[in-house]
Design a protein with these regions (language model features):
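A structural boundary/capping signal
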Residues: 1-275
Length: 275
């Protein structure tokens, strides 16, 4: 693991939300998993993307036209799009690999939209839509875009997307379109990676994701419980018990306390039976 990347990520995590540069933070997440990743190089590549786009537009172009122009640039001219063949490859969450391969998942592709939009002056923010990250263009009039396809979505389109992920009885709610903070975007990016690594039983990588989530939201009991579970899976039972005990001391969440108490009980050393 890249300790320099972790140290810089910790610095960014301590900043006010509006001061966080999402592209840099996302690249640092990737850098911790990949040796010798040159973060400034990829930030420069994003700047070059902006320069290429800027040469295609008129500064006086109405915002609506600029939005369509940017979508065409990202998804047609540059060829960015969703990795439909290997959706759950962790590489899809690493911004440097998305820049290199021009393939990713909704949230990593959203970072391309957000990065370019912020440079151009078009308000672009992430939308923590259930199961499928979206982006919103514009301040007063929201234009909802699926970063996986580059398609502008109507509210009925969003309702269909929701039902595809949550079932036919899912109801579209306005709260699903609330802008995501920068930290919320990073949390979701890390959560996606964590789920992939957890399913692969890649505990070192899972722990790295949890550690960074705790940098973004310190003392969050849910993540501390997950940390205890990682120690348990790694066979470090003393550290697992210690971590679970910390949650019992600090959390008022009865459900979480009950869950942790059961784990602690299961981890108690068994008395030897005399024969």
């Amino acid at each position: 693991m890249n300790e320099d990347a972790r140290e810089r990520f910790a610095e960014i995590a301590s900043l006010p939300d509006d001061d966080i540069v999402l592209a840099e933070a996302a690249l640092l997440i990737a850098a911790e998993m990949q040796e010798n990743l040159n973060v400034p190089h990829y930030l420069s590549m994003l700047a070059n993307l902006y320069d290429r786009f800027e040469r295609t537009i008129d500064n006086e172009t109405p915002m609506g036209v600029s939005v369509n122009s940017l979508l065409d640039f990202i998804h047609i001219s540059e060829g960015f799009g969703g990795n439909v063949k290997d959706y759950y490859d962790p590489q899809n969450s690493y911004l440097n690999r998305v820049i290199d391969t021009k393939q990713g998942i909704p949230i990593s592709l959203a970072l391309i939209h957000i990065s370019l939009g912020s440079r151009i002056g078009i308000p672009v923010c992430g939308i923590n839509f259930p199961r499928h990250f979206l982006v919103s263009y514009g301040a007063e009039i929201q234009v909802i875009v699926d970063p996986f396809t580059g398609r502008i979505l109507s509210k009925p389109d969003c309702a269909t997307l929701l039902r595809q992920h949550l079932g036919k009885n899912a109801v579209l709610k306005e709260e699903y379109f609330s802008p995501a903070t920068n930290k919320a975007v990073l949390m979701r990016l890390l959560d996606n990676l964590k789920q992939i690594f957890w399913q692969k039983e890649a505990w070192v990588e899972s722990k790295a994701c949890i550690d960074r989530q705790l940098l973004l939201l310190p003392n969050t009991a849910e993540f501390t419980v997950q940390l205890g579970a990682v120690y348990e899976m790694q066979g470090n039972l003393p550290l697992a018990r210690h971590t679970y005990a910390q949650v019992l001391q600090a959390s008022d969440d009865e459900h979480l306390r009950d869950q942790v108490s059961k784990r602690l009980l299961a981890l108690e050393p068994k008395a030897k039976t005399l024969h």
